[in-house]
Amino acid sequence: MATPPPKGPRHVRDFARSAFVALALAATITGCFTGERPRFGCAPGESTGRIEIDEVLNRFECVATSTFTADYTVLTRLGDIDSAATVVQASSGRRSITINNVRFIYDNGRTLTCDLVSETCEAVINEARTSDLLLTSEFYAQSMASRLRVDAERRIGDPVASNVVLGGQPALCVAVPVTGGTKTYCALESGALARFDGSDLLVELTSYSSTPDEAAFGT
């Protein structure tokens, strides 16, 4: 018989980090698949069987075709930690994701994880740098797509769709009831996350522009 894991704040935090990293790894191999609902040259993955969920998934899974600058506030509920994040997605797959003082850069085959305070970088994407916040460089779309697919399978009731305005932009939302509460996912037409409200995180869009901020690629 397996010995149950010890309980306590440290072990809860370690479990949360491990679970989030697992979702992040799933997100990194999730892309756009050939399907029946094409959108701007990209088609989402397999249908969940509920259009309310699929329409939001469609946006998340096809974010790669969009260019934008998006600012977010983040609350990591475990530890009650407030953070700020900025995502810049430019053409040719160039991306910059800044979470507090950590910047992840994907730039024409070059990858960097930089500390903006010490002005030092490592030539890899080191997701561990923000694991204490339960955030990865994919938090703004692909991580959310992976989470939403898991919640679609685990839901205990009907999803509810809604339309809201967040960060001055119209967004499509779906609320999914799961054991322990309801999780809400909202996405912009571009595919960028507009809001996520779950038991571990609250992420909200505060401002948005369709123009990529090239300064965000600086280190």
Explain the meaning of each model-derived region.
Residues 63-73, 90-97, 166-175, 190-195:
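Short, hydrophobic/aromatic-rich segments at coil-to-beta transitions
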Residues 86-141, 193, 201, 205:
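An acidic-aromatic
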Residues 84-90, 103-105, 156-165, 185:
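Short, exposed beta-strand/loop patches in secreted or surface proteins that constitute
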Residues 2, 8, 13-94, 215, ...:
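N-terminal leader/targeting segments and the immediate start of mature chains
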Residues 146-160:
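A short, amphipathic edge element
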